[in-house]
Amino acid sequence: MRHPSRAAKALLAAAVLPLALTACSSATGTSASSATAKKPSKDPNAGLLTGAQLKKALAPASFFAAGFAVDPSAARNSGTTYTAPSSSPAAKPDCTLLGGTSWISITGDSGVSFAQNDYISKATSEDIAQEIDTFRGTTAAQVMANLKKAVAACATYTDADTHTKVKVVGADTTGLGDAAYTITLTNSAWQNGSTLIAARSGTDVVTVLSTDGHDNGAATAKKLTARIVTSLKAEHEHA
């Protein structure tokens, strides 16, 4: 039997080595890829409250003065599931949105969950609305920034009922959550103005509207906002 020369053996060994290394590398790469594929992606909604949980943080009927009753048609929440968020701030905001409940929609941002309701006095028609919206990541802070931009573009707007000008004044507010912003709406044709407050608490944005009292609704709006922010912290602790 003919045996290969030493030179031939050396060449054969040199040829086999790269193949072995390639096979080893290939196996290692496949293993790493498999490990990566098996690693679950992080839930973007982890730690966020659902609409059903946010509902519990809204102020109860006992918070409101005698004569106020919830408006069933305005009480809603997103339930136990999350919705896809979106952001589409308008170049020119619809300033009339400040005149109603869910006024935070003026920012063009929508979160993954929400809860809201509205209490009205049948005797005086005074209105107190409350809402909580939850956002992913740092979006809540951006919502607050977008709100300020929108208000800056809305010095006045025309009231649909009286066809008169509504004056809009916004200002940063301390002592409510991580950041807060107060908007005051006044109109000479109204008996009383409105106070809107937006307060960020972590990933949640609390918004209220009040026409209660003789101070443009300011005292009630601040008291309600503080109540909701405190309740939200408790809900997160229990979640």
Predicted regions and their residues:
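Bacterial N-terminal signal peptides that target proteins for export
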Residues: 1-12
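Extended hydrophobic
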Residues: 193-204
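A short acidic/glycine-rich loop-to-helix N-cap element
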Residues: 208-224
